């Protein structure tokens, strides 16, 4: 069988791809050599901006299946309305702070994003492998991420800036406790759970709203590396999780997760013992047990990493009728920030890229958005580009209006007002650990905090853990050579 003809980007056949066109055997290259210029010019532009967070990742295709007829009681989204109904999905797993060439085994939260291609549009669940987050107000997010990256002078990771910020952000104690536990270094993307972390709103066909949190429970089970195992894997195979996911599916394996919700009655949000929209806290499973609403299965690898994984764009603002945002401040900030960074990284028409395209919408996407870089979907054809119009263009339908709810209070920059402090849940987490797990947790924290060269930063950071659990604080003091009385004094006067 003969090989296909090699062409330029414009489709012209190429006679020789290994030698440039020159003036004589030893002469200079001719500018008319379009084959060479076409090749070099495209190569010069192969890299697009790296994601500012979640740069290193892996992805796979699959499906979401509904196992129960109960789901429509709580949510009118059509992809949830029938037992056995399957919705195509694309997932992307990632580390958070590292660059694109960083190790899959680094101690870091893991991104857990799922794009549901539904008949009513794409629904993006953009979560992590942890049920909470470091901060609860998006105003802090750029500062937080800066501290997880590189020092602006040395261009090296800096424990001083890392712990300086976290020590002065006590709400981070819960997430930091998870990060430095065994779950901070998952063995693979298959061996971890996923969470929406944020509270979302479900609305049923009768207009009744509920608050929910989404949980993705790995059917493979959780498996983690110790710090020593993770460091060794980083040296031996920094792409271990990416490789594991691809090879598992290539061999016929189908990684799967049980998808569940915690369901809170709408009115309960006002009565719960802490603000249920605070993403630094979990809802007790005793108060709100898991209810299964689906099963997620991955069964197909990408054909091309760049086209499908690197160009994949997930946004919490991509919702469908029946699923709406909550007042969670971090979620509210992400509703803007995520599509905004996609427009920067991929262009204003990023949702025309096949992996992002809402292809399951019957009749296709219809709106009055036009032009911009890389408009490749017909650009609305000869139809009108304004609304209202008299030429049969698409029109809004009032029945798709979101659920109405009351808001009150003063417009001001203000923190959450809730009675629960930021140390109860991390303290509970520590006390639930086995003695071996506690020892590894303390060792992981001591190992990282040992890089801090400013004592006050160490003392402040340790004081947060001391407030969560005195035994934990004392063990950290011992490991770091800090006088526990200094920590006690700091904790007593700290009013952060």
Curated annotation (Swiss-Prot):
SUPFAM superfamilies: Heme-dependent catalase-like. Heme binds at residue 338. Its EC number is 1.11.1.6. Its cofactor is heme. Its main location: other. GO terms for cellular component: cytoplasm; mitochondrion; peroxisomal matrix; peroxisome; phagocytic vesicle. One of its GO terms (biological process) is response to oxidative stress. It is an enzyme of class 1 (oxidoreductase). It is found in: Peroxisome matrix. Disruption phenotype: Cells are resistant to methanol, acriflavine and thiabendazole. GO terms for molecular function: catalase activity; heme binding; metal ion binding. Pfam families: Catalase (PF00199), Catalase-rel (PF06628). Keywords: Heme, Hydrogen peroxide, Iron, Metal-binding, Oxidoreductase, Peroxidase, Peroxisome. InterPro entries: Catalase, Catalase_3, Catalase_AS, Catalase_clade1/3, Catalase_core, Catalase_haem_BS, Catalase_immune_responsive, Catalase_sf. A motif (Microbody targeting signal) lies at residues 494-496. It catalyses: 2 H2O2 = O2 + 2 H2O. The active site is at residues 54, 128. Belongs to the catalase family. Catalyzes the degradation of hydrogen peroxide (H(2)O(2)) generated by peroxisomal oxidases to water and oxygen, thereby protecting cells from the toxic effects of hydrogen peroxide. This is Catalase-A. It comes from Dictyostelium discoideum. The gene is catA.
